[in-house]
Structures are given as structure tokens and as C-alpha cells.
A protein has these predicted regions:
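A conserved ligand/cofactor-binding region detector
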Residues: 1-816
Length: 816
């Protein structure tokens, strides 16, 4: 039912008054002289007040019902902008828009002033953000725990086509959504030594005498669920020194030395993923991971003891989910807290630890399963290294007692890697210390059992399970694409907004309605025009909104194969030049994504993309049939502009390497067609959407694995069989796209030919053929838009609400 006009008018008036109140008394500005940023802060604070009311109610209910709590530990939370997200979930978006209109303030203009919170990088952090929102929507009592990075990863700029990392200053104007909890402080220790002592009962105990201690200070951000149903807490930790100023040294004239401890402590929460190519960088990463894990575990144990007489029922009252290997030191830290601080016997402490912890694996790349040098661990966390040795000893002894003496198997399941220097295997630690280990797509979970955790799976065959990732439709449909949302609501009714997971399938019959397909195409064109304007503003390239928008936006990594896309781009460019008379499909190739600061090969791929763009976009013989764009500084807000405008979604990772992917789901939900390999969640998308409604190509995971076993990474055979591929590689290698430095890409191409680890060349011809199928379908608009509608209609299963319901039912036991 629609709201009564009088009630609606009152709500608008109340919100307008609340904004004016915040502008005057919280921001300290008169409406006549307020800047746009002052208005943003006032609006955010007014919205936050509404969130706090729901927050307090939800928190009180959770305590009153002794509801089981979920603690989600993640090094990243890519939450993006929160103004529209919060207003939309509270049902206040239209109210706020009308209220501000009466003040001659444009909410859309104000929205753009909010910086993206620099708390993550890619899919891992965005998944965590979607999960937090879904947990609130489903009424699960949850806390997210992470780090309040002052500068995040980095702001990506392009200097002569090269990625340049610049400081991200997202907190310059403060953060109106957060509450500093100055009273919530925990000591976090590093270094020092461990002493064996006898306690009052004559029992030997270990005492850690740390060499350094910093403080973890809590900052809370409310996370509101759909319709304001419930509000959970994202608690982020900021590192502070124990002593802000060494006054004696300062007065002695050592002004820099007086604040050296402050700089060292605060560096922990300064940036996300500091480069780990140096020993100092590795040390800082380990400090970060332990810092937030220790603070979070101390905090949740304190909360538990406020409600329960002891910790012996911890697994019944709390579920701790480790998002990837970054928080896996939690296994050793929880054992330390239980054994050393709460004096729980080792065997019981281990039972509680395993019963409480669960681990999500996000990668099959061995190099991405973190390992730390034993020497570094012994120096930084000596007590934890003792605990890890002891866990490993019990583990190996138990296996031997069961008759397992195979040296290779014992070496594979050990927590200590002995090859190439002794290192602690954090993936194995997380596996052993958790009662559940899940993958994030059906294929990924299957491959976990046969690759990275093959031997551990044989020992614990019930531990690995699958929870295919999902996305929140509130962010990636309602907020990112309001035009499409309005269309869907008109077609399916307003109930869709509360149950998209169940009701989207009712859209299937509309795919055969010409009028609906026409509407669908029109709303896409609207989004493409908006993106074309952004492209013009940011990189100065004019694109045709009626061209096919072919999009690959994600972290730059060799296994994601942006290089394969670029090889196709060059091949297409050459084909258009050689045969301009063909009825080519006008196409805009759109790339975006960041490369890790120390990842040279990925940064070279970005440079290649920009070099190709420069040549193609300035070649008059192409007649605008092909444009290439690399949009810098990809983040959530840019994704919200790109995804609704995409016609073709590139999901072309080497099969068996992408754990799941979630951009595939976001594009599919908005009606983009997918060109991709049978990798990650593409497999399940294929099952839901239908293989006929996607462009699947390339080697399967099984074929890739067979090549790996055979060591078959040479590209010579593929190149010899494909004149098109040979011409492309020759053009890049010879400097056609790098006339200022003709040898710039010689190493890249020679490396590809000699050892094509990610099988770019092997899949090239199949990829070219799939792209030709794309062009054929685009030439038949009524069929293209029929398939586009079907993609949207069949994406309901990929809701993060479904994913979280599965976690809560199968792993956390947290749904009533």
C-alpha cells in the first residue's frame, strides 16, 4: 500500500528539519553559506540517526534472546559509498530527495561528493560487504571485523599509460558514518620472549614477555539491512601507540625520535596490502593481520563473558568466519587466549577453537595461500610460533598413531613447509583449526579437494563444503540501475523488491514480448550514454553509446587474462584495417582494474592496454568501429556506472584458477551477456542461465590440469596453427603499439611463447570464434535482447541472501 499523502508530507518535513538541525548544530553551518560537502555531512548524519534507532533495537533484541553471534573476520571490506545504500535500505531515498528539493539541494549532486571508503581492493572485500548487508537483512546478529585503513590500497593514476600509485585520502573530511569507541581499546603485542613458569598449582605455564605493544581502538559503522529490518556492526580497528609523545626525548631536542613509536604503530592501519617484496613489507603485513585478529578475538571473548559465565560454551554462542587466509593466525591466537589468559586446558581449548572457527578459501593459486618465514614468526610472534609447533606435533603424532607413516603425505599436511626455507603454511593452519572449510563455487570446492588441500581432504573428508558466492541485489540492481529496477517492478510487482531471489524467474515470459525487449534495450542505452559521458570526462575518448560495450573490469592479474582480451583487440583491429568493407559490429572495449604495486607483469599489461588504445583510437582507417578505453581508479562507484551499461561481460580466466568471481553475477543481473570459460561461478551461471545464452569457450579445468601435469605450457603449436595469433604477437613484439620503445613488450611476448602458464595462446582461437558468435547475435537485436532479459530473469539464485542463508544453516547454526 502507498503511504497516505499527509503521512508522507510529514515524513518529508521531519527529514528536512533533521537535516537542517544537523547542518546547524553538528556541522556548524548556516544554510545560506553551506557548501555542498556541508550538506553531505548533514544528510549523512540525519540518515545515521535513523540507522541508530534500528541498531539499538536490533542489539537489544540479540542480547535479550541470547542470539548466536557471527563474527566475520576480513582484511577487506569494500563498502563503497554509503549514502544511497543507507537511505535506500531505510526506505528514505525518495523522502530525502523530496526533503532536499525543498531546500534547493540536489541529492544526486551531493551523493557524488562522498568518497569510496578505501577499505578493500577487489572481489574479496566486496563479497565481505555484500555478506554484511545480507546478514543484516536476514536478521543474523553479526559483527564484521577489519582494519580502518587511513589510506586504503592506493589511488590509481595513469602517467604516460603506466599505473602510478597515489595516496588515497578518503578520510580528509572525516567519516560521518562511523562512531569512534575511544573506550574500546585492546593491547596488541609483538616480539619479545617466552618464559616457562610454574603457576600456583605447580603446573608449568608459558608467559609471553612482549618487546612491543600497541593499542587497537575501535570504530563502529552500522550496516543496515533491507527495509531497516536489522542493523549490524562493522567494527574496524585503528592502531595507536601506547604513548603518543615521548616527552623526555622531545624536550631533549629529539623531536623526530619522540614520535617514532607513533609512526611505527600507526603504520599498521595506514595502508592496505603494503608491498611485501621487502622484509620490512612482509613484517608489516604480518603485523596487520595479527593486529586485527587479536583485537577482534579479545573483543568477542569479552562480549561473550558479559553474557555467559565462562568460555566453555563458545561454539554454541559464537561462530567465527575467516575470510581467506589473512586472518588464519586466529587459530593460534584463540588458542593463546584460551590457554594462557583463561587457563583452559590445551585439549579443551583446541576443541573450542575448532568448534568456533570456520574458514573460507578464495584461491587455488599456491602462491596466494599465505606462508610466513618461520624466522619472522619466531621474532614477531614467539608464543604463537610455539603454539603452531605444538598443534603440528599433536597433528602429526595423531596421524602416525593411526598408522600413517608416508613421508610425502606427512610433509604435505604439515603446518611447516621445509622446502626453500622453513615457512608456516597459513592455509593448512586454517584448515586444521576450523570445523568447516568452504570453497566459493562448486568447481572451486571440487578442485580444493584434488589440489591445494588434497591430502588434508583425505584425512578430513567431511570438512570441505561449498558455498557459492552471491551479490546483494539492493546494491547491484536497485541502487546501481534504478531504471531497470523500475521496469522490473512494473512488470513483476513491488513484491520483487523484497524477494528478488524468488520472483525474478517470473520475468522469463517477458523475454518473448517485443515491447518489453524494446524497453530493456532503451534503459541500457540510457546507462551507456551516462557511461560514455564518464569516459569522455575521465580519459577524453568519445565513444558511440550505440556500439557494443565489451567490458572487462577486475583486478589485473595474469590468470584473469586481460592479455587474452588485448590480443583479441589487436586481432580485431587488424581485421578491420585489412577488410573495412565487412559489416563490422561497432565495439567499445572497456578495461579497468588495479595491479598490485609490486606486480610488474600486471602493470605492463595495463601499459599495453593504454598503448593499444592510443594507436587504435587515433587510426582514421578504423572509422570509429573500434575504441579501446582503460578507465583509471576502478572502485565500487565506478562499477555502479559501468555494470548497467555493459552489453558483454568478459569472464575469461584460465579454467580452474578463478575461485568464483562475483562481477559475472553483477553483469548478468543487469542483463549483460557473458563470454567466458567454464571457471568459477561461470559453471553455475551456465546451469542457471543456459549454455545457449552465454558464449562459453576454451579449455576446461580438467584439460588445464592435464596440461599442468604434462608440463605443456609451450605456445609454439598454438601459434603455428593460427596465422591470426602469430600476426598479433608479432605486431606487439615489434613495437607497432610502442614506437617510442619498440622493445617494450618483447619480454612479455617471448615469455608467453616460452611458458604460457595461463594458456592464453591455447585458448586464443576458441576465444576469437566465441567473439564472432557475439557479433552474429548482436546483428539480430531481437534475439540479443531476448537473451539479455533471460540473463536477468535467471540470476535470482546468485543473491548473497541465499549464500548467507546456507552459511547460517550449514556452518554457523545461526538461524532461528
Amino acid at each position: 500500500m502507498s503511504q497516505e499523502p499527509k503521512a508522507r508530507d510529514a515524513e518529508v518535513a521531519d527529514f528536512r528539519a533533521a537535516v537542517l538541525d544537523k547542518l546547524t548544530y553538528a556541522v556548524g553551518k548556516d544554510p545560506e553559506h553551506a557548501f555542498d560537502h556541508d550538506w553531505f555531512e548533514a544528510i549523512a548524519l540525519a540518515a545515521r540517526d535513523h540507522m541508530v534507532d534500528h541498531w539499538m533495537d536490533h542489539t537489544r533484541q540479540a542480547y535479550r534472546r541470547s542470539q548466536k553471534r557471527v563474527y566475520y573476520l576480513s582484511l577487506e571490506f569494500l563498502i563503497g559509498r554509503l549514502l544511497y545504500d543507507s537511505l535506500s535500505n531505510l526506505g528514505l531515498l525518495d523522502v530525502a530527495r523530496d526533503a532536499l528539493e525543498g531546500l534547493n539541494v540536489d541529492l544526486e549532486r551531493i551523493r557524488l561528493l562522498e568518497p569510496d571508503a578505501a577499505l578493500g581492493n577487489g572481489g574479496l572485500g566486496r563479497l565481505a560487504a555484500c555478506f554484511m548487508e545480507s546478514m543484516s537483512t536476514l536478521g543474523i546478529a553479526a559483527h564484521g571485523y577489519g582494519i580502518r585503513y587511513e589510506h586504503g590500497l592506493f589511488r590509481q593514476a595513469m602517467v604516460d599509460g603506466w599505473q602510478q600509485e597515489q595516496t588515497e585520502n578518503w578520510l580528509d573530511f572525516g567519516n560521518p558514518w562511523e562512531f569512534e569507541r575511544a573506550e574500546v581499546i585492546y593491547p596488541i603485542s609483538f616480539g619479545g620472549s617466552v618464559e616457562t613458569v610454574n603457576d600456583t598449582h605447580g603446573q608449568q605455564r608459558q608467559v609471553w614477555w612482549p618487546g612491543e605493544t600497541v593499542r587497537a581502538v575501535a570504530y563502529d559503522t552500522p550496516v543496515v539491512g533491507w527495509r531497516g529490518s536489522s542493523v549490524n556492526t562493522l567494527r574496524l580497528w585503528r592502531a595507536r601507540a601506547l604513548e603518543e609523545l615521548h616527552l623526555e626525548r622531545f624536550n631533549a631536542g629529539d623531536h623526530l625520535g619522540a614520535v617514532a613509536e607513533v609512526a611505527r604503530a600507526e603504520s599498521i592501519s595506514r595502508v592496505l596490502y603494503p608491498a611485501d617484496s621487502t622484509e620490512a613489507g612482509q613484517e608489516l603485513r604480518l603485523r596487520q593481520e595479527y593486529f586485527f585478529v587479536s583485537a577482534s578475538l579479545q573483543d568477542l571473548l569479552r562480549r561473550h563473558l558479559n553474557m555467559h559465565k565462562d568460555l566453555l560454551n563458545l561454539p554454541d554462542a559464537a561462530a567465527i568466519q575467516l575470510n581467506d587466509t589473512h586472518p588464519s593466525i586466529a587459530v593460534a591466537e584463540l588458542m593463546r587466549l584460551l590457554v594462557d589468559q583463561h587457563e583452559i586446558p590445551w585439549e579443551k581449548a583446541w576443541e573450542l577453537t575448532v568448534g568456533t572457527l570456520a574458514y573460507t578459501n578464495h584461491t587455488l593459486l599456491p602462491e596466494a595461500l599465505e606462508t610466513w618465514p618461520v624466522a619472522l614468526m619466531e621474532r614477531m610472534l614467539p608464543r604463537h610460533m610455539q603454539i603452531i609447533y605444538l598443534i603440528n606435533a599433536y597433528h602429526i603424532d595423531a596421524l602416525r598413531a593411526k598408522g600413517l607413516h608416508d613421508f610425502d603425505v606427512l610433509r604435505a599436511v604439515s603446518l611447516i613447509e621445509e622446502d626453500n626455507g622453513r615457512r608456516v603454511r597459513m592455509g593448512n593452519l586454517a584448515f586444521l583449526g576450523s570445523h568447516s572449510v568452504n570453497g566459493v563455487s562448486a568447481l572451486h570446492s571440487k578442485l580444493m579437494k584434488s589440489t591445494v588441500f588434497a591430502e588434508l581432504h583425505k584425512l578430513y573428508p567431511q570438512r570441505i563444503n561449498n558455498k557459492t558466492n552471491g551479490i546483494t541485489f539492493r546494491r547491484w540492481l536497485y541502487q546501481a540501475n534504478p531504471q531497470l529496477t523500475a521496469m522490473l517492478v512494473e512488470a513483476l510487482g513491488p513484491e520483487l523488491l523484497d524477494d528478488p531471489e524468488g520472483r525474478l524467474a517470473n520475468l522469463v515470459p517477458f523475454a518473448d514480448k517485443g515491447s518489453f525487449r524494446k524497453q530493456f534495450a532503451a534503459q541500457r542505452l540510457h546507462s551507456k550514454r551516462a557511461l560514455a559521458s564518464i569516459i569522455q570526462d575521465r580519459v577524453g575518448v568519445t565513444v558511440n553509446p550505440e556500439a557494443l560495450f565489451d567490458v572487462q573490469v577486475k583486478r589485473i592479474h595474469e590468470y584473469k587474462r586481460q592479455l587474452l582480451n588485448l590480443l583479441h583487440t589487436v586481432a580485431l583491429y587488424q581485421a578491420i584495417r585489412n577488410d573495412p568493407g565487412i559489416n563490422w559490429v561497432p565495439r567499445v572495449k572497456i578495461f579497468a582494474g588495479k595491479a598490485a604495486a609490486s606486480y610488474h607483469q600486471a602493470k605492463l599489461i595495463i601499459k599495453l592496454a593504454n598503448d593499444i588504445a592510443r594507436v587504435v583510437n587515433n587510426d582514421p582507417t578504423v572509422r570509429g568501429l573500434l575504441k579501446v578505453v582503460f578507465l583509471p581508479n576502478y572502485n565500487v562507484s565506478l562499477a555502479e556506472s559501468i555494470i548497467p551499461a555493459a552489453d558483454l561481460s568478459e569472464q575469461i580466466s584460465t579454467a580452474g584458477y578463478e575461485a568464483s568471481g562475483t562481477s559475472n553475477m553483477k553483469f548478468g543481473l543487469n542483463g549483460a551477456l557473458t563470454i567466458g570459460t567454464l571457471d568459477g561461478a561461470n559453471v553455475e551461471m551456465c546451469e542457471q542461465v543456459g549454455a545457449d545464452n552465454m558464449f562459453i569457450f576454451g579449455l576446461t579445468a580438467q584439460q588445464v590440469e592435464a596440461r599442468k601435469r604434462a608440463g605443456d605450457f609451450g605456445a609454439s603449436a598454438a601459434i603455428a596453427a593460427s596465422n591470426r595469433l602469430s600476426d598479433v604477437l608479432q605486431a606487439i613484439r615489434s613495437g607497432v603499439f610502442s614506437s617510442d620503445d619498440p622493445g617494450r613488450y618483447a619480454g612479455l611476448i617471448d615469455g608467453l611463447i616460452a611458458h604460457d602458464r595461463f594458456l592464453v595462446c591455447a585458448d586464443f582461437d576458441a576465444y576469437w570464434d566465441a567473439q564472432r558468435r557475439v557479433e552474429e547475435l548482436w546483428h539480430t537485436p531481437q534475439e540479443w535482447w531476448r537473451v539479455a532479459v533471460l540473463n536477468t530473469a535467471r540470476m535470482g539464485w546468485f543473491s548473497s541472501d541465499r549464500t548467507i542463508r546456507e552459511y547460517a544453516t550449514d556452518i554457523w547454526k545461526a538461524l532461528d
